[in-house]
């Protein structure tokens, strides 16, 4: 969908320093990174076939992109080693999104940023009813995608606070096109 690419073009160029991309997939975000301010991208994805495509796409970026074939819920990397994390259209498919967000929180440096663009639960009850109704079947045919995840609530519960949050529909069926995008930072520890 064209609107998804527009959101990538808005959010991904904000990434800086050492970047962790959760759900790197086939590398759809590569062309949107600003490698003048990005030192390295480490991509995490459990899908071997997608990572193979991403690896071939990454060859034009002078070894600035590397890959780890793991799930987002348990990443074998040192804590507080990334300046920012990019998550794009991935929280809908992660089986345990709160565990994944806890890992993101652990891996981010203290003042690091989480840049996100996701689709999820719509604000209108009438659309939500359809999202809930269609979710089980959709999940089976769309690679585990959950139509009805409340992305705002997940990110807050995952230990973050919003620096910038935008929510709106893009072109497309309402059950698929409600977008959450912006920047979050680690919430203060109490």
Regions found by a protein language model. Name each.
Residues 1-18, 28-32:
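Conserved alpha-helix/loop element of class I SAM-dependent methyltransferases that forms part
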Residues 20-74:
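Class I SAM-dependent methyltransferase SAM/SAH-binding core
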């Amino acid at each position: 969908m064209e609107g998804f690419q527009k959101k990538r073009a808005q959010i991904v160029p904000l990434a800086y320093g050492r970047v962790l991309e959760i759900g790197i997939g086939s590398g759809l975000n590569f062309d949107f990174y600003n490698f003048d301010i990005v030192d390295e991208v480490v991509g995490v994805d459990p899908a071997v076939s997608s990572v193979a495509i991403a690896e071939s796409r990454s060859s034009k970026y002078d070894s600035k992109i590397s890959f780890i074939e793991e799930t987002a819920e348990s990443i074998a990397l040192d804590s507080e080693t990334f300046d920012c994390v990019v998550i794009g259209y991935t929280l809908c498919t992660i089986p345990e999104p709160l565990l994944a967000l806890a890992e993101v929180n652990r891996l981010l440096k203290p003042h690091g940023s989480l840049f996100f663009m996701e689709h999820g639960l719509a604000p209108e009850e009438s659309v939500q009813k359809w999202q809930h109704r269609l979710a089980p079947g959709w999940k089976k045919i769309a690679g585990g995608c959950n139509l009805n995840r409340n992305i705002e609530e997940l990110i807050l519960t995952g230990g973050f606070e919003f620096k910038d949050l935008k929510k709106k529909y893009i072109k497309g069926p309402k059950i698929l096109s409600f977008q959450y995008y912006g920047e979050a930072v680690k919430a203060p520890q109490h």
